[in-house]
Amino acid sequence: MEHREWFAPEEDKDYIKSLLSTHTGIIWKAIETVSGQTAGLFIVVFPGKNSENLGYDIGLPEAELCSVAHMDTVAVHPNFRGYGLQRLLISQAEEALRKTQYRYLLCTVHPENSFSHSNMEKLGYTYIKQALKYGGLPRCIYLKKRT
């Protein structure tokens, strides 16, 4: 995988299985219709009051932590990059979350990942701060607050 350091260390098949089996995450997949190949995927995580909740990093009150959704992981196959698939997947997830209690949409982006920084800003996310996350890795935290 290109730029492995842009991803958190725990993002593997076991991580995904755990999210699905505990109902603490949802996955969106984009499938190329002719070949059936996975073009991209996007994971949303519902951290609750887990210590990894990015709400703690931005100073949300305890009562708001269960309103946080992590716009967690996006991966687009190299053959499908450049078509806006990352933004499309995130937009689909946001639409699905629109009528839920999740008002604080938070994500992290590696400081050198200019593509994701640009996409998050185009989607209306605001840069909040840089912090060390995932065992000491530098990450920029973005927030989109829904009313």
Where do the PLM segments sit?
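Conserved acetyl-CoA-binding loop-helix of GNAT-fold acetyltransferases
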Residues: 76, 82-95, 118, 122
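Conserved beta-strand-loop-alpha-helix junction that forms the acyl-donor binding cleft
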Residues: 78-81, 107-117, 134-136
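A short, internal acetyl-CoA/4′-phosphopantetheine-binding micro-motif in the GNAT/acyltransferase core
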Residues: 31, 59-61, 71-81, 109-110
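Conserved acyl-donor/pantetheine-binding loop and adjacent beta-alpha core of acyl/acetyltransferases
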Residues: 37, 43-73
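Active-site rim helix/loop that mediates acceptor-substrate recognition in acyltransferases
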Residues: 5-33, 43
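Conserved GNAT acetyl-CoA-binding A-motif
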Residues: 97-109
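Conserved catalytic-core motifs of GNAT/GCN5-like acyltransferases
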Residues: 47, 108, 121-140
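Conserved active-site alpha-helix within GNAT-family acetyltransferase domains
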Residues: 87, 99, 111-129
